Amino acid sequence: MAFLQGKKILITGLLSNRSIAYGIAQACKREGAELAFTYVGERFKDRITDFAKEFDSNLIFDCDVTSDEQINALFADLGKSWDHLDGLVHSIGFAPREAIAGDFLDGLSREGFKVAHDISAYSF
């Protein structure tokens, strides 16, 4: 029996086959997990749909993690397909463009730091 056989895992932050989330999704699937995926905005929907198919999943959810309402809606929608969640992969990293431009710390503002921390660390 595989290590994660029958476990239900939500993967966030998958954007390409070079994403850490992609490697984690591969390992989870190889070990028997069922996977669901999130994306943010219509711009990424088709890409994540294709990745989900690669992992034999049709569970994809639009979720802006800066919105508590969207996070709550995500779990409500996921609950329509799964009766529980065994794991969540938080692989989301973001900072405003101006916060990462130029030399180290040149573009970093208090607000930019708050946004980066909220999305990259606090969101779930």
What do these predicted regions represent?
Residues 40-44:
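Helix N-cap at the beta1-alpha1 junction of Rossmann-like dinucleotide-binding domains, i.e.
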Residues 86, 101-124:
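Catalytic Tyr-X3-Lys loop
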Residues 76, 80, 93-94, 115-124:
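Amphipathic alpha-helical dimer-interface segment in Rossmann-like NAD(P)H-dependent oxidoreductases
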Residues 2-38:
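Canonical Rossmann dinucleotide-binding motif of NAD(H)/NADP(H)-dependent dehydrogenases/reductases
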Residues 52-69:
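Rossmann-fold cofactor-recognition segment
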Residues 57, 81-85, 113:
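Local beta-strand N-terminus motif with an aromatic residue
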Residues 66-81:
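Conserved Rossmann-fold cofactor-binding substructure of NAD(P)-dependent oxidoreductases
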Residues 62-63, 83-101, 120:
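Rossmann-fold scaffold of SDR-type NAD(P)-dependent oxidoreductases
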